[in-house]
């Protein structure tokens, strides 16, 4: 029940623009080396794009977004981000030209809404200091005991943090899976029971 790795990140919503095409994306600013310690995202980046991302920065774009915008690795797009202070709702969004370094293909919904950006660049776009982040992603040795974890190692973190684990956020999905398994088990028992009853009935009638 211990933390084995952690990765700071900056998360924000932006518009990606290519010509007259726009797409809303959830951008996550990450450090490549730290992200490798807590997730397997690098395995789903096409070609050598993950290494290029580590060396050059840029944007790792979900394959669904790339297809909708008609862009590929090496192309340039514009990121439209609302003003960091959020005081003037009518203010023009910040516009930043970034190069698409790689394409992320998960063959799922995230392909249509997810993008990765280098952490320092994300901090700069959001007007954050170097030690300011949105959150810290943790990897633990036993995911099923996250509610019993000791998070004291985060007490000295330079920024106030609030704990949110997967059980609180997505635990209902796990419980639903368990419920479906139970229902399927009961259904199979009933089907087998009815089949056995029919066989026995047929044999009795034949005798």
Task: Give the residues covered by each predicted segment.
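A structural signal for hydrophobic secondary-structure junctions
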Residues: 2-116, 120-131
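Hydrophobic alpha-helical context, especially transmembrane and signal-peptide helices
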Residues: 20, 53, 93, 167-169, ...
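Poly-acidic low-complexity segments
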Residues: 31, 49, 142-145, 198
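A short, structure-level motif marking secondary-structure boundaries and short turns
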Residues: 47-48, 135, 199-200
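A generic secondary-structure micro-motif detector
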Residues: 52-55, 139, 204
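Mechanotransmission and gating elements of multispan inner-membrane complexes involved in transport
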Residues: 86, 91-184
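Hydrophobic alpha-helical transmembrane segments of multi-pass inner-membrane transport and secretion
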Residues: 178-207
């Amino acid at each position: 029940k211990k933390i084995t790795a952690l990765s700071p990140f900056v998360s924000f919503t932006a518009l990606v623009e290519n010509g007259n095409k726009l797409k809303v994306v959830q951008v996550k600013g990450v450090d490549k080396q730290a992200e490798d310690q807590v997730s397997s995202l690098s395995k789903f980046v096409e070609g050598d794009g993950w290494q290029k991302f580590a060396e050059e920065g840029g944007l790792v774009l979900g394959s669904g977004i790339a297809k909708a915008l008609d862009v590929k690795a090496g192309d340039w797009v514009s990121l439209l981000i609302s003003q960091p202070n959020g005081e003037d709702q009518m203010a023009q969004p910040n516009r930043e030209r970034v190069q698409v370094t790689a394409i992320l293909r998960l063959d799922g919904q995230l392909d249509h809404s997810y993008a990765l950006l280098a952490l320092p660049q994300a901090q700069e776009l959001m007007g954050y200091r170097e030690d300011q982040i949105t959150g810290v992603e943790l990897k633990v040795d036993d995911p099923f005991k996250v509610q019993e974890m000791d998070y004291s190692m985060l007490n000295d973190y330079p920024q106030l943090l609030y704990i949110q684990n997967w059980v609180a956020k997505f635990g209902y999905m796990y419980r639903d899976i368990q419920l479906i398994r139970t229902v399927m088990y009961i259904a199979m028992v009933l089907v087998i029971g009815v089949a056995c009853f029919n066989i026995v009935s047929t044999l009795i009638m034949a005798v």
